[in-house]
């Protein structure tokens, strides 16, 4: 059977596990770089099966639902507007249209959960941009901090999205090895990579 981007694993279980650990560690602040892009037609607490946007994790809504201080940023006005609509009523949620790296350079709260999901894998410098975001954010990560990175199961081969050829691909290709060298541990690996300082 030939591989298709549509046959990929959904990020749901990784997002749920990151939230579970965040709550067990009494986390206070979540930062998401790259917010929700599509609507969904299923209850948010259920893993999507037949939802057309099944491969999107709807992370923005999951994180807003925790009640923690939640900051989500994106450069797309359309994505920001959708995120604001879908998280309306969540008191501790701040959605902002700004470049993720610029945001992180001006963010000074301790981060308990960082989600890196901004520059699409198809963008030539996606891995480098996510590494830059990590480098800026790491000094703000709390001692019990978690980092979740989406789209680590794919890469670009001959100009097309394909399964990752390295252990960590896509958005985590550069971040994960650097973070591991700095003491971060991989808790989960697949569609997403979940890293922990503990």
Where are the predicted features?
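Conserved SAM-binding loop and adjacent beta-strand
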Residues: 2-14
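Short, flexible loop segments at the rims of nucleotide/cofactor-binding pockets, characterized by
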Residues: 6-9, 48-51, 93-95, 122-126, ...
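SAM cofactor-binding core of SAM-dependent methyltransferases
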Residues: 16-104
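Active-site flanking residues adjacent to catalytic metal/cofactor-binding acidic residues
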Residues: 31-33, 73, 114-118, 147-151
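Short acidic, S/G/P-rich loop/turn micro-motifs used as interaction or catalytic elements
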Residues: 37-40, 120-123, 153-155
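A short acidic, Gly/Pro-enriched loop at the edge of an enzyme's catalytic core
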Residues: 106-113
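A short SAM/SAH-binding and catalytic strip from SAM-dependent methyltransferases
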Residues: 113-127
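C-terminal substrate-binding/active-site "lid" region of AdoMet-derived donor-dependent transferases
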Residues: 124-198
């Amino acid at each position: 059977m030939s591989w298709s981007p549509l046959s990929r694993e959904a990020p749901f279980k990784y997002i749920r596990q990151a939230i579970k650990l965040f709550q067990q560690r009494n986390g206070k602040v979540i930062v998401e770089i790259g917010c929700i892009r599509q609507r969904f037609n299923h209850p948010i607490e259920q893993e999507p099966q037949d939802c057309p946007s099944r491969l999107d994790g709807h992370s923005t809504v999951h994180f807003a639902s925790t009640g923690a201080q939640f900051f989500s940023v994106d450069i797309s006005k359309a994505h920001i507007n959708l995120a604001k609509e879908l998280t309306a009523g969540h008191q501790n949620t701040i959605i902002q249209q700004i470049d993720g790296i610029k945001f992180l350079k001006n963010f000074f709260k301790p981060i308990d959960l960082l989600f890196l999901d901004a520059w699409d894998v198809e963008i030539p410098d996606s891995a480098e941009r996510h590494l830059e975001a990590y480098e800026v954010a790491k000094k703000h990560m709390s001692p019990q901090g978690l980092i979740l990175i989406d789209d680590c199961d794919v890469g670009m081969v001959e100009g097309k999205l394909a399964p990752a050829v390295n252990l960590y691909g896509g958005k985590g290709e550069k971040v994960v090895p650097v973070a591991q060298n700095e003491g971060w541990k991989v808790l989960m690996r697949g569609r997403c990579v979940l890293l922990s300082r503990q």
